[in-house]
C-alpha cells in the first residue's frame, strides 16, 4: 500500500493492478473506521478511508485506461489522454510519476511490458 503515491506494481514478478485491487478488496471488510493502516510507503499512517481512496483511484485509472485500450489507443495516445489527471496533484508527486504509472497500467493490461 502506497499512501498517496502511485504504486509500483512489479508486473515482471507476477504482480498486476487488478491483483492489487483484489488484495485491497479482501482487506477492506476486515477493518473499520478505527483501524490504523500502516502503509508500506508514504510518510504517514492511514486508515480505512485512505485505503478505500487508494483502491478507488486504482480502479478508476484501470477502468479509464482499459476503455482507451478497447478503443485501440496506443500507449502514446493513452498518455496524451491523461487518465490520471484528477489524482496527479496528490498521488503523482513521488518517484512514480503519472507517466510511469500510466505506462505500468497500460503494459499490465495489454501484456506489453
Kindly label every feature range from the protein language model.
Residues 1-29:
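Catalytic core of the metallo-beta-lactamase
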Residues 11, 52-53, 93:
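Alpha-helix capping and helix-loop boundary segments enriched in small/acidic/polar residues
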Residues 70-113:
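C-terminal regulatory/interaction regions
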